[in-house]
UniProtKB/Swiss-Prot annotation:
Keywords tagged on the record: Hydrolase, Magnesium, Metal-binding, Nucleotide metabolism, Nucleotide-binding
Protein name according to UniProt: dITP/XTP pyrophosphatase
Residues the entry annotates as binding substrate: 7-12, 74, 154-157, 177, 182-183
Reaction(s) this enzyme catalyzes, per UniProt: XTP + H2O = XMP + diphosphate + H(+); dITP + H2O = dIMP + diphosphate + H(+); ITP + H2O = IMP + diphosphate + H(+)
Family label: Belongs to the HAM1 NTPase family.
Organism: Campylobacter jejuni (strain RM1221)
Length: 200
């Protein structure tokens, strides 16, 4: 069984390939011509399913027999911002680049008079194939701070300190991050489903 990842985000592709290294993984653009997918769901799970369905439906009939489309939708929910940016994490600033999104998050927090806040990351994984549709979910709790620290990671990693740590995700090694991340937790559950489907 082959897995096609319903994302063109290079950072996400690397992270997903690392965590799912027991499977034969292909990035979206290795199999299909890239196309835009409108993420108009109201939850992480809905958006993950929208992306996985779109990619699976774009495969030809032979490919559909060989592939499962796997998608991740994830984001950060900040308590003092009433759970925002949430499902809009990737496009929070309106510009779609990580630095602008981080800057907006810090500015919004400071506007409310806070230098840090409790926050949590959420990841929803969706899998779509001829056998049906499946989804899993993972969370990681911690706090966001107003100063970027660390060089690793992407997204909001340089602002987020996981619970039980004194470093941001961007200061942790790839292995340290992958062992605690929301995406890792959701993918560990997804692996169980994928192994069952592979036997079937």
């Amino acid at each position: 069984m082959k897995i096609i990842l319903a994302t063109s985000n290079k950072h996400k592709v690397l992270e997903l390939k690392e965590i799912l290294k027991d499977f034969e993984i292909y990035a979206f653009d290795e199999v299909l011509m890239p196309f835009e997918i409108e993420e108009n769901g109201k939850t992480f799970k809905e958006n993950a399913l929208i992306k996985a369905r779109a990619v699976f439906n774009a495969l030809d009939e032979k490919q559909k027999k060989d592939f499962i489309a796997l998608s991740d939708d994830s984001g950060i929910c900040v308590d003092v911002l009433e759970g925002n940016p949430g499902i809009y994490s990737a496009r929070f600033s309106g510009k779609g680049d990580d630095k602008s999104n981080r800057d907006k998050l810090v500015n919004e927090m400071i506007k409310k008079g806070f230098k840090q806040s409790k926050a949590h990351y959420v990841a929803a994984i969706a899998m779509v194939g001829l056998m049906g549709e499946f989804s899993t979910h993972g969370t990681m709790h911690g706090k966001v701070i107003d100063t970027e620290k660390g060089e690793n990671g992407f997204g909001y990693d340089s602002l987020f300190i996981p619970k039980g740590f004194d470093k941001t995700l961007a200061q942790l090694s790839v292995d340290e991050k992958n062992n605690i991340s929301h995406r890792f937790k959701a993918l560990e559950l997804a692996k169980i489903i994928l192994k069952i489907l592979n036997k079937g």
